Amino acid sequence: MSAIYLRRLEVADAEALLEMLLRDRAFLDQWEPTRPDGFYTLERHQKRLELLQGDESFADFGIFLAAGDELVGRIQLSEISRGPFENAYLGYFVSERHNGRGYATEAVRQVVDAAFGELGLHRVQAAVMPRNVASVRVLEKAGFREEGLALRYLQIAGAWEDHKLYAVTAEEWRSGA
């Protein structure tokens, strides 16, 4: 049995999500785009979660501990494209105090299973800063392959950061590559 489970985030989760984001703000700021102060409000998260309920281009999951149901992270499939692409972008984080326990790797495996199963996608891709060694390991352990380096890909803390690009296809996933 897994130590974590995924559940689509609901409006009722907004308070726990905001508390986690505020607690981990300094930790997350080194890896994520700079957020305006308005991002860190309960109203903003309630509204965003409500809007996402019917959005088929976005799948937003909480990472919860199986024992106690504590929200310990978030994992998302965004920009879900249909038609000839059948692709999504993967993003995730685990609360700093829960890092290093394998939760991110397990969450990635679970969400990719859903992407290729329930959602019927063909490809999932992710981008990660090379210096984020823990996240690189998560993707590699979960079966993603490195595709290249995108120079000055995303602005993080005011600086344009390079990102390694990773992906996995449904065929690779099913073959256990």
Regions found by a protein language model. Give the residues of each.
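Conserved catalytic-core motifs of GNAT/GCN5-like acyltransferases
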Residues: 127, 145-163
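Conserved acetyl-CoA-binding loop-helix of GNAT-fold acetyltransferases
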Residues: 92-94, 100-114, 133-141
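Positions that flank functional sites
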Residues: 36, 131, 154
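Conserved GNAT acetyl-CoA-binding A-motif
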Residues: 118-127
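Amphipathic alpha-helical segments that line or abut small-molecule/effector binding pockets
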Residues: 11, 15-19, 105-117
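Structural motif
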Residues: 119, 141-142
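GNAT-family acyltransferases
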Residues: 1-97, 160-177
